[in-house]
Amino acid sequence: MRTTLFLLFAFLLSMSSACERPSRTEVARAATLTGGGNARAGQTEIRKYGCNTCHEISGVPGARGLIGPRLDGIGERYYIAGELTNTPNNLMLWIQHPRQVESHTAMPEMGVTEQDSRDIAAYLYTLR
């Protein structure tokens, strides 16, 4: 019984840290980087466009995808999809038109608007 309770507690603790909201400082930095992207809206838009189906993304319930890469720490990576230098404009381009960048990518064109790509990029840049 103790083992079961311990495991349950450990699981709940890990889930609460995965759902932490970005700090105000992180949100402000992400908005500056992306030219006005709204990180909080981006967190919602990730689910709207189904990004959580393929990717594991902190703070997004159910985002435990096994197809695309884990998106935590994307702001610290040198390249996006192994093709583009990691800049806010390139991340927004990738989010909107992945097949224009890499024609053989598994990532589909989802019809993401420019503003939504800005918001999603802002959220992704808050992830550690």
Model-predicted regions and their roles:
Residues 1-4:
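Positively charged n-region of N-terminal signal peptides that target proteins for export
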Residues 20-47:
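Electrostatic cytochrome c docking/interface patches
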Residues 50:
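The −1 position to Zn-ligating cysteines in a subset of zinc-ribbon hairpins
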